[in-house]
UniProtKB/Swiss-Prot annotation:
Sequence ranges of Acidic residues compositional bias: 1164-1175
Keyword line: Antiport, Cell membrane, Cell projection, Cilium, Developmental protein, Differentiation, Flagellum, Ion transport, Membrane, Sodium, Sodium transport, Spermatogenesis, Transmembrane, Transmembrane helix, Transport
Name the record gives this protein: Solute carrier family 9 member C1
Organism: Mus musculus
Keyword Glycoprotein: no
GO CC terms, sorted: ciliary membrane; motile cilium
Record's subcellular location: Cell projection, Cilium, Flagellum membrane
Amino acid sequence: MEMEEISENLTASHSIKLTNMWLELLKSVFLSTPQDLPEIILILSLICTVGAFLNMHLKDFPIPLPVILFLIGCCFEILSFASTQIQIYADAIQWMDPDIFFGIFTPVIIFNVAFDMDIYMLQKLFWQILVITIPGFLINYTLILWYLQSVNKLSLKTVPWLLFSAVLISSDPMLTSASIRDLGLSRSLTNLINGESLLTSVLSLVIYSGVVHIRFKSKSVNHTLAHKVMSTAWSYIVESFITGIVFTKVIQLWMATIFGDDVNHITLIFSVLYLIFYVCELVGMSGIFTLATIGLFLNSTSFKPGVEAFLLEFWNCLSFIGFLMVFTFIGLLIPAHTYLHISFSDVYYSLNIYFTLIVLRLLVFLLMSPILSRLGHGFSWRWAFIMVWSEMKGTPNINMALLLAYSDISLGSERERSQILFHGVSVCVITLIVNRFILPMAVTKLGLRDVTSTKYKSVYYTFQHFQELTKSTAMALKFDKDLANADWNMVDNAIILQNPYAMNQEEITEHQKVKCPDCNKEIDETLNIEAMELTNRRLLSAQIASYQRQYRNEVLSQSAVQVLVGAAGSFGEKKGEYMSPENIKNFSESKKLLSFLRKLLLNWVYNTKKDKGVPSRYMFLHACHRIVFTNEFEYTGYLVVLMSTYPMIICWISRLKDIYDNEIKCANYYFLAFYILEALLKVAAMRKEFFSHTWLLFELGITLVGVLDIILIETDSISYNFDLTETVVFMNVIRLLRILRILKLVTPKLLQIIDKRMSQQISFRYSILKGYVQGEMDVLNIIDQIASSKQTKQILLKRVMRNMEHAMKELGYLEYDHPEIAVTMKTKEEINVMLNMAREIVKAFRSKGIIHKVEGTEINKLIMAKKIQVLDLQSVIQPFNVEEAPCNIPWLSEDPEAITFIQEKAKVVTFDCGNNIFEEGDEPEGIYVIISGMVKLKRSKPHLEMERVSAESEIKIHPLPHTEYLLSGEIIGELNCLTKERMQYSATCKTVVETYFIPISHLYEGFEKRCPNMKHKMWQKIGLAITAQKIREHLSFEDWNYKLQLKLCNAFIRDIPKSMKTDIYDETVTHVVLIHGSAEDCQLRKIYKAPFLIPVTCHQIQGMEDFTKVMIIQTSIAVRKFRWNVRKYIPPRRISMKPDSERESFETLDETSEEDNGKKENQENEELIEENINI
């Protein structure tokens, strides 16, 4: 018993010791923290705080922020020798390994810079950047290496010199981009500098890593130097580039289903980037080159709207933190005793290196300037000079210098390591200080600031217009009763902003004048080349903003917005050229390869069910016909072809061919016999029709070549026992062609894939054209702000209208050829618009406190789930047919009785291409609903919105489209049938048009007897369309969909009589739109003609025609209750204008009724409060 107890105790104690050992191991691995962790956290927080403070307050300081941070780090390192407490904090940083230092900060900085590049301009400048960064980089690198070895001050070997040359040639793309951002350089020059700086830094990092890798491989693998260089270049450049493209596609596909700024996905993609970097480094590729490739091919349109903004801010924040850490830590990582050994010769050597780099870089640019200037985009010696002085050295140079100084490569003594690090960092500091002073002066002296006098004046007047709008808004707020006792003098002084583009009186009154070459007459205003170029740039900027806005609203796809923005950006720097539908067509042309492949498959592969032919009367031929056209016979042929591939493959392998020579011959005889038998059976079954099929003749030709091969072998004309001759190779290739027969099996699937791909290309082209048309319509709304003078406005207006007409015609032809594509695109677009509006409603409810944050989050999840379902929506939706046409008419869709009535006498009318549906001046015959096709509406002369507007009116006057194209689903003749006026335009069919015709007599029969509300619905539909367009011109583009729909929910139609005045605006009315006829402002005596948004300053109008209608938009009920329930300011109750209400003046209401109404509302509010309290 005692022995058992002792053994049990020993076992228990042993298990306890094992448990304690595992616990200690887990604690040491997972729960241990370095003793200096608090010091590290304090230093990092202090660096971020100081760096952010200096960046905010020392932007214009002569000494750059990186130099200040470096000096702070140096001071901290020197003070660490004087104080033990400071030494503790310095040691917390100096333990960091250079590889960790490089791997933490460099990847995020390089990726962020690449991601922020303008990929469209880089594509345009591709050849210039390629010439600069490949031959130019190699020449510059060779010259730097030659200079360092010639001077040989540091007495290094070949490998350290190669690495130190890479340190000196590199540049910092982030600091370079920041240095030229506010200098006013042209867009082409700015992107050329940024692209060259990024690729130079990446190539220098690749060369540094490659040299280290080659040196490491030389110790372990015995290969020639050329083999090592080629294999390293292949893995570090080619493989890294391919990997970057693959990961780009994977990230785009992954992020395609992410909507909104989901923090989990943002964190995950950040982690994925570092994972990609370290995986590439582990497998022998360049992680930096891979990340730069991913950053260049990813851009803001690679992600769903709402994601890219958060990502960009997140990466900018990380890049800035990395920038602060690098320049502060490097001051700490240079040993303090290095400064004690600094002599004048060391400083002179650093200055010598700096000026030598400048001279060599300028020499390289001047040598390549003839080639660069011939590549276009205005390259000159001035550009070369600016590119030389704009180069900033920073993070890549410091990281490589740190790696070189602390690497295992033999550099001699510790002092030589410190000298390498000192000279590498000192050249960066000198570059940052000197170039900061010289670069702005060089830009000014060389006249490269892209700020012309016309542009300067335009910006001045734009700022002045902005100031006037601010003051006018303040004037309107003075009438608000809640702000009556505010100190408006202080408000007026507070909103006065100093114009940064102020000019003297002479510059303001000066007008650039040009003389006419014919009459030598001075032309006033600024209608010259400079003004037109400025207008073109603003136009392109407005178009790009419209395309990006459509993408954020999910109207445009990612690929479509990339093409549109790229096309617009490619014309930003081309003088005298502008974007047009022809240019868009070049970008959006579908690939013709798919059409060729589809025709090839359809022509080569015959359909057995269709080509059976007529069986012969003879028994033998009839039996052959039955055998040939069975599935068993066909699939037996496929099986034999598959079996014959193995001997054919063996024929190409010399060793196996010698071993199985007899077997291959026997197999060849058997297979050839089967092919001959198959051909004879097909000839007997199909007879003459056999020779009308290309594929059968092709197979017969291959069989005859096989027979010829057998004859040549048997007669010893050729032999397969020796090396392959041309004849043998030809015979083997002909045999392999028989494998193409297998394509007949997969042809249906291939055709489905090709058809789907072609459908995607057509959808892509449709999206581009529609986005372009919407962009031109958005430009029309702000054309007054774009044009700098009346003449440029007229030129721009004609151009925009012409381009929009051309694009609409192309869109119409595309929709006519592929109606299912148009229906699918419109359906998906409308679903996305509605879901976005639902999200805006949830956002508005949350801001007002109607729903809680948790409830809003749950609703948003449901909306996001629906948006993901839209991605999986069927690719093709068939257009509606004639039976469904009445259900798609807005004023019939919810009334089954009206639909039944309309269908009684409505009919389908088809017009040939070129026929007129009606001509201008004809009496209206009825309403035409376009089922399919395209109709061109044209007026005999341009029709202005306002023909009788007084001269002192300041209302915009834009000509309506002289020519317009209507597509399927649109309705013609509604307004003329309602007013019984003659047609104001001609309707011509540009294609075969199928319409759903409703006679006017039948329509009025419905108005009077069966469906009296139908007339009001038609006016409502017309009024909403006009009102939406007019209100859109005065709403913010960002959220106009939600605001507009919110406003149109409270709209109704009202007639304006000709014989009496009508009050329109009161506190319950937000907008009044004149949708038909004309009216006169009773106070200002201005005449407004439809369509027109009547200004708020107009309180009474009177009709000028027998038939005048307005659309009135009221505030929501909740807003009116809020306004009326203010006890201190109880306004007089006013009757809003309802469609059927009697006219009553706002001033004739009795005061007692006002008090009664106020008391009644107050009582209702008190009861409501009591009910809420009880609940």
